[in-house]
From Swiss-Prot:
Keyword Nucleus: no
Aminoacyl-tRNA synthetase is among the record's keywords: no
Gene Ontology CC: Golgi membrane
GO biological process per UniProt: ganglioside biosynthetic process; glycoprotein metabolic process; glycosphingolipid metabolic process; glycosylceramide metabolic process; oligosaccharide metabolic process; protein glycosylation
EC number of this enzyme: 2.4.3.7
Name of the protein in question: Alpha-N-acetylgalactosaminide alpha-2,6-sialyltransferase 3
This protein's encoding gene: St6galnac3
Residues spanning the membrane: 9-29
Origin species: Rattus norvegicus
Membrane-related topology note: Single-pass type II membrane protein
Reactions the enzyme catalyzes: an alpha-Neu5Ac-(2->3)-beta-D-Gal-(1->3)-D-GlcNAc derivative + CMP-N-acetyl-beta-neuraminate = an alpha-Neu5Ac-(2->3)-beta-D-Gal-(1->3)-[alpha-Neu5Ac-(2->6)]-D-GlcNAc derivative + CMP + H(+); a ganglioside GM1b + CMP-N-acetyl-beta-neuraminate = a ganglioside GD1alpha + CMP + H(+); a ganglioside GM1b (d18:1(4E)) + CMP-N-acetyl-beta-neuraminate = a ganglioside GD1alpha (d18:1(4E)) + CMP + H(+); a globoside MSGG + CMP-N-acetyl-beta-neuraminate = a globoside DSGG + CMP + H(+)
Residues carrying sugar: N239, N301
Length: 305
């Protein structure tokens, strides 16, 4: 009897320790916790990620308007994973890590099918250039039916996004929401586009139009993500010095297609007299923002001093 009584405190302490361990694992990782429950014979336990209960009320972003409802975007994320389209993602095998983020952001028509091991399979927000909308419409079921929970944010100049019937891209989007009523498609307002141009001028001292350049989809992604996310982890984006570093890794411009070399494309755009993206200049700005916001870059790693 005395032996049993001595064991009870030890059992109680062990049980409490186990509960604390499970709670800690739940806080640290909402994804692998259900797998641990399976080990205890509860595979059918209904699981609600703790991060769902901790989320802040949705924040309204008035610079982005729903094509169907004409309502502004409501979005608020905790930890965001922003996945680059770069060939740097090939072979990284960080798909599971990416999918553990509260919100996964992708750009343009970058696919997940066939690349899940490297880039994950979930997408919550997809920021898309007006020039990439026709690429989405080549496979509309994949982007707007299978991925109906994804929020699409389309950016483009007023001439293509105008709502008076003369905006060629806006007309495409209107037809898309008619065909796919569950699709969540938002367009960037003219005022927000002007704001993004202003940020570029403030950060670089250069007028975007006068310098003959176009902002990249990455630029628009960062502008929105910094408003919507508490912290940001960027995967597969190179910094401004990468292409001049001896022995740098040569990769395709996109992870999902062979062809253009990433660094060649960056240098071509950076020095184009007209119509180019200032990718390298933008990366300098991103590094500056990382000093002020909770932003980290990996695969490859950035040193932000």
């Amino acid at each position: 009897m005395a032996c049993i009584l001595k064991r009870k405190p030890a059992l109680a302490v062990s049980f409490i320790a186990l509960c604390i361990l499970l709670l800690a694992m739940r806080l640290a990782n909402d994804v692998t916790f259900p797998l641990l429950l399976n080990c205890f014979g509860q595979p059918k336990t209904k699981w609600i990620p703790l991060s769902y209960t901790l989320r802040q009320p949705l924040q309204t972003h008035y610079g982005y308007i729903n094509v169907r409802t004409q309502e502004p975007l409501q979005l608020n994320c905790n930890h965001c994973a922003v996945v680059s389209n770069s060939g740097q993602m090939v072979g990284q095998k960080v798909g599971e890590e990416i999918d553990r983020a509260s919100c996964i952001w992708r750009m343009n028509n970058a696919p997940t099918k066939g690349f899940e091991e490297d880039v994950g399979y979930m997408t919550m927000v997809r920021v898309v250039s007006h020039t990439s909308v026709p690429l989405l419409l080549k496979n509309p079921d994949y982007f707007f039916k299978e991925a109906s929970t994804t929020i699409y944010v389309i950016w483009g100049p007023f001439r293509n996004m105008r709502k008076d019937g003369n905006g060629i891209v806006y007309n495409m989007l209107k037809k898309t929401v008619d065909a796919y009523p569950d699709a969540q498609i938002y367009v960037t307002t003219e005022q927000r586009m002007t704001y993004c141009d202003g940020v570029f001028k403030d950060e670089t001292g250069k007028d975007r139009v006068q310098s003959g350049s176009y902002l990249s989809t990455g630029w628009f992604t960062f502008i929105l993500a910094m408003d919507a996310c508490y912290s940001i982890h960027v995967y597969g984006m190179i910094n401004e010095t990468y292409c001049t570093t001896e022995g740098y890794r040569k990769v395709p411009y996109h992870y999902y297609e062979q062809g253009k070399d990433e660094c060649n494309e960056y240098l071509l755009h950076e020095h184009a007299p007209y119509g180019g993206h200032r990718f390298i200049t933008e990366k300098k700005v991103f590094a500056k923002w990382a000093k002020k916001h909770r932003i980290v870059f990996t695969h490859p790693n950035w040193t932000v001093s």
